[in-house]
Curated annotation (Swiss-Prot):
Cofactor: [4Fe-4S] cluster
Source species of the chain: Neisseria gonorrhoeae (strain ATCC 700825 / FA 1090)
The protein, known as: Dual-specificity RNA methyltransferase RlmN
Family per similarity comment: Belongs to the radical SAM superfamily. RlmN family.
Co-factor remark: Binds 1 [4Fe-4S] cluster. The cluster is coordinated with 3 cysteines and an exchangeable S-adenosyl-L-methionine.
SS bond partners: 104-338
Main subcellular location of this protein, as a coarse class: cytoplasm
Domain of life: Bacteria
InterPro entries reported for this sequence: Aldolase_TIM, Methyltransferase_A, RlmN_N, RNA_MTrfase_RlmN, rRNA_lsu_MTrfase_RlmN/Cfr, rSAM
Catalytic activity annotation: adenosine(2503) in 23S rRNA + 2 reduced [2Fe-2S]-[ferredoxin] + 2 S-adenosyl-L-methionine = 2-methyladenosine(2503) in 23S rRNA + 5'-deoxyadenosine + L-methionine + 2 oxidized [2Fe-2S]-[ferredoxin] + S-adenosyl-L-homocysteine; adenosine(37) in tRNA + 2 reduced [2Fe-2S]-[ferredoxin] + 2 S-adenosyl-L-methionine = 2-methyladenosine(37) in tRNA + 5'-deoxyadenosine + L-methionine + 2 oxidized [2Fe-2S]-[ferredoxin] + S-adenosyl-L-homocysteine
Transmembrane segments: none
Record bears the keyword NAD: no
Lineage: Bacteria, Pseudomonadati, Pseudomonadota, Betaproteobacteria, Neisseriales
Amino acid sequence: MKTNLLNYDLQGLTRHFADMGEKPFRAKQVMRWMHQSGAQNFDEMTDLAKSLRHKLNEQASIEIPKLMMSQESSDGTRKWLLDVGTGNGVETVFIPESDRGTLCISSQVGCALECTFCSTGRQGFNRNLTAAEIIGQLWWANKAMGVTPKNERVISNVVMMGMGEPMANFDNVVTALSIMLDDHGYGLSRRRVTVSTSGMVPQMDRLRDVMPVALAVSLHASNDEVRNQIVPLNKKYPLKELMAACQRYLVKAPRDFITFEYVMLDGVNDKAQHAYELIELVKDVPCKFNLIPFNPFPNSGYERSSNENIRIFRDILQQAEFVVTVRKTRGDDIDAACGQLAGQVQDKTRRQQKWQQILIGQQG
């Protein structure tokens, strides 16, 4: 079987070329061809010796996930569905803004966690994505979006906030991050690459040590009672442990704050008392809040908080001198908004079946 070179960061490529008896600089050349020029085969790599190209064609490949579907929202948001084999597809979303272009990347086929308000979680879980399948999303988006009139890349920021829990696919995510940051890859700044987690504490510590990029934490609750219900991972890593991990992460983080993401669920976590509890919870963690109006999906069982409740919640946090943004809903007409990504998941957990049985029971 041929080796897919998209699975390697520069260190891995260098080892691979050493095993082939080639000099280390070949790794940098090939990496630039793949990620900066968008090369899909070795014959395009004209500065490589013909003998090396022949050897690479025999032993290696550049396998990028196939594009199944592309959609564009009325607000300019774009979504791609990529085929990752065996009936599975993952979604990637590009969000244009006046000062930046952000790509939201998936890390798993489905999600192993079961956050109750998330469409991806309802789809169940099939497998982790390979490093090639993760970086392949940026490859596709980069090819589709091109460059600005000033010859700058349209994609300036990457957030690991698509399908899946990135920390549960740690090694492959770190390899993909390494390619994103490498000057021979995409040359992104650590400050402009964000990994989001629901709170896998040991992996947060590992990421801090090996690849400290910006960190976002899917918080969504101000106390353990509520969070246990809507983010079941909290039963393993409760809020006290999570806050301590956030403090440790900041020691090496490229930004001097953690972003806490908080989906606003009507009657669940959006009362004034929850805002005051949040203030107490995060008092020792430099942070900013991103309030996310819930994006409905069929049979979710939740409603979006009213604009008034969101405003009151925001004002309480701001009065306590926190930076607070209320996320604009982008791409909801193509199901590309936060919490709506579902892709195509051949579920191995029977979670889809479980939710169907619950719904049948509710309708009966």
